[in-house]
Amino acid sequence: YRAKAFGNGEVERVSPMEQSGQHRYNMSPTGKWAIHTYSNASTPSVIDMVSFPKHQSVRMLEDNAQAKDQYAALGLNPKEFIKVKSGNLTLDAWMIKPVDFDASKKYPVIIEVYGEPASATVQDVWGNGDLWQQYMANQGYIVVSIENRGANTPRGREWRKCIYGEVGTFSSEDQSRGILDMARQYPFIDASRIGITGWSGGGSQTLNCMFRYPKVFHTGIAIAFVADQRLYDTIYQERYMNTPQNNPEGYRKGSPITYAEGLEGNLLLIHGTGDDNVHYQNCEMLVNKLIKNGKMFTQISYPMRSHSINEREGTTLHLRKTMAKYWLEHLPAGGK
C-alpha cells in the first residue's frame, strides 16, 4: 500500500489484486524500483524486479516453477483460512485436513501455537513449517493455528498494546476459547482429542494452555520454552512486560511455572542443554516443580544443542520422529 506523506489522502493498494498472499519489497533509494517477493501458502516465492508507480514487472529473477509443480504433485489439502471467536473478539486461524478426510467423522486436533508479540503464525505465505504440518495432518489429524491477541499482525494499536504487562495470559485464554469455538463451528473436530505444541514462546504458551486449561488441552509438546519470564533476556521481556520490580504480578501470572500443579494431560518437554537463548535452567526449574506436585510427564534433553535444536548429525530427524511418535501414542489419530 502507499499513501501521501502529507494530507489526508486515501491509502492505495500497490501490490496486484490477483496475487493473493504476502508481498515483500526491497526498495531502491529513489523509490522507482524494487525487488519484489511474492508467495502464498501453496506458491513458493516468486521474485522479480518491478518499477513504480505502476508496479510493472520488468525482470523475473526467480519463479520457482519447478518447486511449485513438485508441491502441487503431492496432492495435499490446502490450508484453509478461517475465523474463530474468543468471546466478542474475532481471531484469524487456519486448518489443514488429511487427504483422506471424511466429514462424517471426528478427528483429533494439533494446534501449532506461538502466541507471543514477536511473530505470527496465521500468514498466507510459503513455508512456515507447512510440509511438517501437512505430514502430521496426513497421519490422521486436523492441524490448526489460531492468532491470539498481541500477535505481530496489522490489526491496530489496541490489538498490539493490550497485552502489555500481560504476556502469557490473554494468549492462552484466546487459544482455549478459539479452539472450542472451532469445534462448535466444525462438527468433524473432536473436542475430546485436542493437542497443542509450540517452540520458544510457543512452548511457553503450550505450557500455559496445558496447565491453565487442562479440560480443553489433553496432550502437549513444549519445545525450548520459557518457564519463568524472570529468567529471559531483558531486551525482549521488559519491552512487553516492564521490569519484574515494577510488574511482579504480571510476571507471575504470565509464567507457566506458576500453574504447573494444574497439569492433567500428557506432556512432553524438549530442550537443548546448550540453549543460549532460552537457558536450560527453565526446563530444570519446571521439572522440579512438576515433580514436587507429583505430576507425570516425559522429557527429552538434547546435549549441547542450541535453541534451534538442529546441531550434529541426525538431530532434526530424531526430533521430528520423537514428536510424531508422541502424538501417535498419546493423541490417537484418525477419524472416528
Give residue ranges: language-model regions.
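Long hydrophobic alpha-helices with heptad-repeat/coiled-coil character
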Residues: 1, 11-12, 224
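Blade-edge beta-strand/turn elements of extracellular beta-propeller
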Residues: 8-16
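Short beta-strand segments and strand-loop junctions that repeat across beta-rich extracellular domains
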Residues: 1-3, 210
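Serine-hydrolase catalytic core recognition
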Residues: 15-16, 22-336
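Short loop/turn segments that connect beta-strands within beta-propeller blades
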Residues: 4-8, 52-54
